[in-house]
Each structure stands twice: as C-alpha cells, then as structure tokens.
C-alpha cells in the first residue's frame, strides 16, 4: 500500500478510471446470469477487496472506522449502492456508450445539489456547462426513442441514478468533511449485493460468469475505486474530473473493439457535447468541487 501511495495522484486516478472503463464489456460478456445475479456477485467480490483494503489501512481500528463514519457514512453508502445497482441495470439493458456518457453528467447534478444543499452559487460558466450537458443528454435520449426498444430506453433513464447517487455522495462528503467515507464503499457493496440477492431468484451461476463477476468486483470497480480514492487525495478536483472522463472515452471504444457495439453518430455527438461541457467547467469554472 505504501508503494502505491508513492505513485503520483493523477496517475492513480487515470489508472482507476481505465479500470472502470472495462465495466461495460464485462457486463455484456456474461453468458447466462441475469442482471440481478451479476449485481450480487459483482458487489460480493467488491466488498471482499474493500474489506482487505480497510484491514490493511485501519488494522485494529477496522470496526471503529465504521462507527466513526456514523450516519453520514451509511447515507453515503446507501446512495452509492443505488448507483452500483443502476450501473449494472443500465449496462445490461442499454448500450455501453449511452451508459458511459450519462455517467459524465455527475458534474451537472453536483452543481445543482450543491446549490440547494450547500448554498453554493452557480456561476455563468457552470450554467453554460449545465445547458450544454443537458443538450447532449437530450440528443442521446432522442436518439434512443427513435432506434432503441422500450427496455433500452428504460436503461437510459435508470442510468441517471448513477450520476445522481455519486453527486449525493459528494454532497454528503462536503457536508461532513471530517468523516472518512472509505467504509461507505463497503456499505455500498453489501447493500447493492443484498438488492441483487433479493431479485436474483437464485444466485448460482456458471464458472464462466462467476469469473467475470470476480473480474468486475475485484479488479474493475475494486481497484478502480481504491486507486481513485487514493489519487484524489493529492490531485486537484478539476484534474480528477478531467481524468475521470477516461472512463467515458475508453468504455465505448472497448465495446466497439471487443464486442462490436457501434454507437450511432447521434449518441457520439451527444456524448461529445457532454464531455465538452465537463471540460469547459473544469478549466474555466469556479473550483467548488
């Protein structure tokens, strides 16, 4: 762990974002597991690696770390668990490109929630970014209405739970800056696994699918979230926001190359507008986040 911490923060965030970008092709590669079974096993393995990380980091204070995080930590974990569930649902029912581009709207929801709950003003740059971002979203949803099934369109709608849940988590962190939110990731993993268990019907899946769930939980989101958490500690928020766009760029490209999922030009256009709005806000907006 000390060796990892010696790596520059931006590099850790970038590697973490690259890990997250594999989520789409992993979910699409399951053979027989339904989405709730995928959710259960993915979060089960995620909870294991977070537990190992917490044991290495906190040692004898492992259980105390949960107590210290208190209600804010639980609320943060609950919010993140809904995001985890929405991610699997969206990737299972709609395209990787749509899901990844919708995830990038987190900044829009973050600015909006910050205005209402943190009393942080929305400046002109942020307002322009929000308008641009929502324009991109409307293009993606409009495209979905014309060329996708009702199930795929529902996947796009559910996908919005992800950026909203992540924005809620950040707002909780901002409201309680002294509370360690790392234990909240374990809480999120367990709660999401419970959601999957309830709706899965049965949890037995093939060895092939179990291996994919292991890759998703242990490496894709496990290493991804841990590296981003460590890297964010020494990386300016604006740079983190830009580096996190790696997931939205690599995700659709990986789906294109490995599973031949080619996004329509309208989706690419809408996604490009969303990414531009985030870059615009990151470089020219107030560094509230």
Language-model features, listed with the residues they occupy:
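Glycine-/small-residue-enriched transmembrane alpha-helix faces in small-molecule transporters
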Residues: 1-39, 78, 86, 148-175
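Membrane-interface interhelical linkers
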Residues: 1-18, 46-75, 121-127, 145-154, ...
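C-terminal-most transmembrane helix of multi-pass membrane proteins
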Residues: 2, 43, 245-289
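Helix-helix packing/entry segments at the starts of transmembrane helices
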Residues: 11, 99-105, 173-191, 221-257
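Hydrophobic/small/kink-forming positions within alpha-helical transmembrane segments
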Residues: 21, 77, 81, 85, ...
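Specific alpha-helical transmembrane segments that line the substrate/conduction pathway
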Residues: 37-39, 43-48, 88-119, 238-256
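Loop-to-transmembrane alpha-helix entry segments
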Residues: 67, 100-103, 119-139, 149-156, ...
């Amino acid at each position: 762990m000390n060796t990892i911490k010696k790596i520059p923060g931006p590099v850790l965030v970038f590697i973490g974002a690259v890990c997250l970008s594999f989520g789409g092709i992993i979910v699409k590669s399951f053979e027989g597991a339904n989405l709730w079974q995928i959710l259960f096993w993915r979060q089960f393995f995620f909870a294991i690696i977070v537990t190992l990380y917490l044991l290495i980091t906190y040692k004898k204070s492992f259980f105390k770390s949960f107590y210290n995080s208190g209600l804010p930590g639980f609320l943060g974990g609950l919010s993140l668990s809904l995001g985890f569930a929405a991610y699997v649902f969206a990737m299972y029912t709609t395209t990787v490109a749509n899901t990844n581009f919708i995830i990038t709207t987190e900044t829009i929801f973050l600015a909006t929630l910050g205005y209402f709950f943190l009393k942080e003003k929305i400046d002109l740059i942020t307002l322009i970014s929000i308008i641009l971002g929502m324009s991109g979203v409307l293009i993606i949803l409009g495209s979905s209405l014309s060329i996708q099934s009702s199930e795929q369109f529902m996947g796009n709608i559910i996908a919005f739970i992800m950026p909203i849940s992540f924005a809620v988590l950040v707002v909780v962190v901002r409201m309680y800056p002294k509370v360690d939110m790392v234990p909240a990731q374990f809480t999120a993993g367990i709660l999401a696994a419970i959601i999957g268990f309830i709706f899965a019907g049965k949890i037995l899946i093939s060895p092939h699918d179990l291996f994919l769930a292991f890759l998703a939980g242990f490496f894709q989101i496990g290493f991804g979230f841990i590296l981003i958490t460590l890297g964010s500690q020494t990386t300016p928020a604006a740079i983190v926001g830009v580096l996190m766009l790696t997931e939205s760029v690599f995700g659709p490209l990986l789906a294109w190359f490995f599973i031949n999922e080619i996004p329509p030009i309208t989706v690419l256009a809408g996604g490009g507008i969303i990414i531009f709005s985030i870059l615009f806000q990151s470089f020219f907006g107030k560094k509230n986040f």
